[in-house]
Each structure stands twice: as C-alpha cells, then as structure tokens.
Design a protein with these regions (language model features):
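A short beta-strand-loop structural module common to alpha/beta enzyme folds
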Residues: 44-62
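Catalytic nucleophile-elbow at a beta strand-turn-alpha helix junction centered on a G-D-S/GDSL motif
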Residues: 4-23, 27, 31, 57-61
C-alpha cells in the first residue's frame, strides 16, 4: 500500500468556491472545484487520497505565495507581545489591488523595488496557529481589515519578535502536488513577470510537482506588463509567457473553457433542461471567451470569475486529466 496522495489547492475565492455548497471544503459530493476533484478521484478508484481546499476569499497573490511557502514572509518591524494581550500586525489598505499598511512582508523584490505587504483574510485550518521563532500564536481579523496575534500557549511572559522574523502558517507545506490558482484580486498593481516568478518559486516547495491554473477570464489584461494593443494580442502574450514558464504544468482555463467547457459539463449530466438552441448560444459565447451566466455562481452575470457547480466541474475534470498526464497518480492513490 502506497502512502496517501496529498493535493493542496491553494488560491483565493475561486478556489474556495464562493457561495458554493461546502465552500472552503473538499468533501465528497460538494461543489467547489477541490471537492469535485476529490469526488472524481474517489469515483475513479483513487482511494488513498486527500485534497485540501486552501482557498481564501479576498486574498491577493502575495498571501497565496506566502501560504504555499514559496517565498518567506517576515515581520517588518520589532514587535513586543504582552502577556495575555493581542498586538496588531497592521490594517490593510488597498489601491488598485495593491496591499499596504501591514507589518508582514513577502521576502521578494523585483525591479520595481516595491515592498510586498501580506494580509491574511481567513483564519481557518490552514492559517492558525502561526509560528514565529518557535512560539505559536493565534492570528485573527479584527476591526477594519486588521490582522492581530496573541500567544497560543501563554507562559505569562512578554515576547519580543525581532524584525525579520519568519512567520509560518499552519497548512501542510509538503504536499505531493500543489495546485495554484490566483491573481484575480491583484488588479493594475500586478505584473505577469511577478506572477511567473513567484509561481516558479512555489513550484519548487514540494520538489516540483504542481499545476498552475490560468484565469477563466481576462484578468491579465489589467496587469501592467502584458503586451499587446488588443485583447487578443494580450491573451496570446500571456499564454506564451505562461507556457514558457510552466510548460505542461499550466492549464489555460481561458482556452479550455472556450474549446471544451460545455462538452465536459454536458457529459457529466449538467444542462439537461437547457434547449439545444440555448446550448448553441452558450457555445458561441465560450468561443468568444465570454463565460455564459449558466457557468457563473449566481446564474445571472456573464464573465464573472466565480463559477457555478457546473463551471467548477469543468475545472476539476481538467485538473484530473492533467494529474494523470503528468504522472502524478497511480491506482492506489499514491505518487
């Protein structure tokens, strides 16, 4: 019997599964893409498998990278944590997707010279307890976008945290496979270069077994360094850079939904009550890279990054296929 295969799905609300049945979870039969991936694996005989939904709604790529552990997160200034009291890690401010105002920094610098602040939006099983210099703390969100910490096990002593101390979150840092899906919250402050460099660092955390999911819509049009005068030119540039950076580890959801999304959903039994004419309209929209409302969580808006159960099923199938093609699966569920 091989060891259990552990898959971490790390990202923001599109991984969490906004307003989905069993959101922020990966239980059998639930609706988020990690849960549907787990269901597909179990239904295909992969019994010895664990899929973790590490999606945090509202987080930017800095936080996703931090939680994976691809780049260290450090305390930016010396902190004194009093006995039995909380201390602030700063209040998050945002401008065009950029986070400022926190006392947590990603240890990464590109040619921009910007300091990359970190702010965790959720304090669930993959965040708490955080560990700094061997001491465990509980982190929380209080007031207006303020991260605070207090000692988990009090010894009735004041604690000094020197500037530059590394913070570890509680998630499993050495899964067999990391599936990375993010970037929808970063806006104009983000760049494709930063996305690829940070993701490549995350890819090495567990020895290089990873999958990168591209966005289902054109969020990359907002990133500062994506070249092209038209939307199509920008997409081709984004796709080329991602394929060059990640090779066959990259799943281009923008393209896959256009070519295969509807057929995958129909094959799984979805859209039985939709007419052939309505399906033709959906297919035409997908070919033009428009996400139909039937694939969106509220069934109303088009092109929303937050998908419905049907949309997340498509992602789960594509990930399952790629796990097999990359040789990450065997029938016993191990690696």
């Amino acid at each position: 019997m091989s060891e259990k295969l552990v898959i971490n799905c790390v990202g923001d609300s599109v991984t969490e599964g906004m307003e989905m049945r069993g959101h922020h979870a990966s239980g059998y039969g639930e609706a988020s893409y990690p849960a549907q991936l787990y269901t597909i694996l179990k239904d295909n005989g992969y019994e010895n498998v664990e899929v973790n939904n590490y999606g945090h709604g509202g987080e930017c790529y800095n936080e996703i990278v931090s939680r994976i552990g691809g780049v260290a997160t450090v305390i930016s200034e010396s902190l004194t944590v009093p006995d039995n009291a909380k201390i602030s890690l700063g209040v998050r401010k945002r401008d065009k997707g950029k986070t400022t105002g926190t006392k947590l920094r990603l240890c990464y610098e590109d040619e921009s010279g910007e300091e990359l602040c970190v702010y965790y939006t959720q304090m669930s099983h993959d965040t708490n307890p955080v560990t700094i210099n061997g001491t465990q703390y509980i982190m929380s969100v209080e007031n207006d976008n303020e991260n605070v910490i207090h000692k988990m096990y009090t010894d009735h002593k004041e604690t000094i945290i020197p500037a530059g101390s590394v913070l570890f979150t509680a998630n499993k840092r050495n899964p067999d496979v990391n599936i990375i899906f993010g970037g929808v919250n970063d806006g104009e402050s983000f760049t494709l270069k930063r996305f690829t460099e940070l993701t490549q660092k995350c890819a090495q955390v567990n020895g290089g077994k990873y999958i990168v999911l591209g966005s289902t819509n054109a969020v990359f049009n907002d990133w500062g360094d994506v070249k092209g005068d038209t939307a199509e030119e920008k997409y081709k540039y984004y796709r080329k850079i991602c394929l060059d950076s990640f090779g066959i580890h990259f799943i281009d959801l923008y393209d896959e939904f256009s070519k295969r999304g509807l057929d995958i959903a129909i094959s799984a039994g979805y859209f039985k009550n939709i007419t052939d004419e309505e399906k033709s309209v959906m297919r035409e929209k997908l070919l033009r890279h428009i996400m139909p409302s039937e694939f969106v969580y509220d069934k109303k808006s088009e092109n929303n990054v937050h998908l419905s159960e049907e949309g997340y099923h498509v992602i789960a199938v594509l990930v399952f296929e790629r796990l097999k093609l990359l040789g990450y699966l065997n029938q016993e569920g191990g690696v």
